[in-house]
């Protein structure tokens, strides 16, 4: 604590990201894509004219927003972009959720949500997951100043159908419903087609997972024009140039190579299902997943103990200190070779 900190900063409990090791480890703890970005991204990086870096980027990132609009079949005016989906989410919390009524969110979900609430003085209420570790959408049918949830959820991996989200929106018309789709490309069903019917729906996404661009920081939101205008007002009161020139061009290149995107996505899904079966044969309970990770617990061994044993063997997975999750591990899907190494290590640990 410093005497120079404001009282609000003293009260913060910051988000703790997954470990980013300096030594060479098999890294299955932060849900990064195991495959490189599309070849067009590498071409952008190799051929980018360095002299252009002396110029500010387009503050609206119009070309990138146009590419996203084409990809998702919406108008350019319905697209917002930011420096990673974390920034997009942070701006959305400021723009829409500082209300007299509480924001509703799952008790177990992306742990940045309560951090934003504390930072921006957003009143919120957590909703417990059901006995199958699913977000209970009907539990959001109470008086609220907004609803936010990840679909598929993290760290559990379960995703709701588009019809289920539409039913939620039919019942909640007076506040913003934010659906965080960071993992939707690995088997979930996107809510983006619903934005034409529901002006209070905001869908956020990221290039970090299915597009392999975690190192460049690029996220987006899709919604009604009035919601996008609200995000722009907050952004332009904070940072008018959140996306640099290289990232704009790289993002466009990633979007244009649909075949590469589909191939990588299918590889991750195939490896996930193969890994699920192998984990179950070792005595793990594996939650159904529509994401690029598996949420698991062993019938005998404690999660923390397995986490430590794997780390000693050079493999990082994610363990959460939260009491309700202490028996669980979240395992990112890596390459086939990386998952083979994981299974080999677990065979030794859980013998």
UniProtKB/Swiss-Prot annotation:
Would the keyword Nucleotide-binding be found if you checked this record's keyword annotation? no
Q: Name one Pfam family in it.
A: Aminotran_1_2
Q: Which residues get modified to N6-(pyridoxal phosphate)lysine? A: 209
GO terms, biological process:
L-histidine biosynthetic process
* Keyword flag Transferase: yes
Which reaction(s) are listed as its catalytic activity? L-histidinol phosphate + 2-oxoglutarate = 3-(imidazol-4-yl)-2-oxopropyl phosphate + L-glutamate
InterPro entries this protein is in?
Aminotrans_II_pyridoxalP_BS, Aminotransferase_I/II_large, HisP_aminotrans, HistidinolP_aminotransfase, PyrdxlP-dep_Trfase, PyrdxlP-dep_Trfase_major, PyrdxlP-dep_Trfase_small
Q: Which cofactor does it need?
A: pyridoxal 5'-phosphate
Query: What are the EC numbers?
Result: 2.6.1.9
What UniProt keywords apply to this chain's record, in alphabetical order?
A: Amino-acid biosynthesis, Aminotransferase, Histidine biosynthesis, Pyridoxal phosphate, Transferase
Family stated for the protein in its record: Belongs to the class-II pyridoxal-phosphate-dependent aminotransferase family. Histidinol-phosphate aminotransferase subfamily.
Subunit-level organization: Homodimer.
Name of the protein: Histidinol-phosphate aminotransferase
According to its UniProt entry, this protein's organism is Chromohalobacter salexigens (strain ATCC BAA-138 / DSM 3043 / CIP 106854 / NCIMB 13768 / 1H11)
């Amino acid at each position: 604590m410093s005497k120079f900190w404001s009282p609000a900063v003293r009260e913060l409990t910051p988000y703790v990201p997954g470990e980013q090791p300096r030594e060479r480890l098999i890294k299955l703890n932060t849900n990064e894509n195991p495959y490189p970005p599309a070849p067009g991204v590498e071409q952008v990086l190799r051929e980018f004219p360095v002299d252009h870096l002396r110029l500010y980027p387009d503050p609206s990132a119009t070309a990138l927003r146009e590419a996203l609009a084409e990809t998702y079949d919406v108008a350019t005016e319905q697209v917002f972009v930011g420096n990673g989906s974390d920034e997009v989410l942070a701006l959305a919390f400021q723009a829409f959720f500082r209300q007299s009524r509480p924001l509703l969110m799952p008790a177990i979900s992306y742990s940045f949500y309560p951090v934003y609430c504390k930072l921006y003085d957003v009143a919120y209420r957590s909703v417990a997951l059901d006995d199958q570790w699913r977000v209970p959408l009907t539990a959001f049918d109470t008086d609220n100043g907004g609803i936010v949830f990840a679909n598929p959820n993290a760290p559990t991996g379960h995703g709701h159908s588009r019809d289920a989200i539409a039913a939620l929106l039919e019942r909640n018309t007076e506040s913003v419903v934010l659906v965080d789709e960071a993992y939707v490309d690995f088997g979930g069903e996107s809510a983006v087609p619903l934005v034409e019917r529901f002006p209070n729906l905001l869908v956020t996404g990221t290039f970090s997972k299915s597009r392999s661009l975690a190192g460049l920081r690029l996220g987006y939101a899709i919604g009604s024009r009035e919601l996008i205008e609200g995000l722009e007002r907050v952004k332009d009161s904070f940072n008018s140039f959140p996306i640099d020139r290289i990232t704009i061009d790289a993002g466009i290149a990633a979007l244009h190579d649909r075949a590469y995107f589909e191939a990588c996505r299918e590889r991750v899904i195939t490896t996930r299902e193969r890994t699920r079966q192998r984990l179950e044969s070792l005595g793990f309970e594996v939650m159904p997943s529509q994401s690029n990770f598996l949420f698991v617990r062993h019938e005998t061994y404690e999660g923390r103990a397995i986490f430590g044993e794997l780390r000693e063997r050079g493999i990082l997975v994610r363990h959460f200190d939260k009491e309700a999750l202490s028996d669980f591990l979240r395992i990112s899907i890596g390459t086939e070779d990386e998952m083979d190494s994981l299974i080999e290590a677990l065979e030794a640990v859980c013998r």
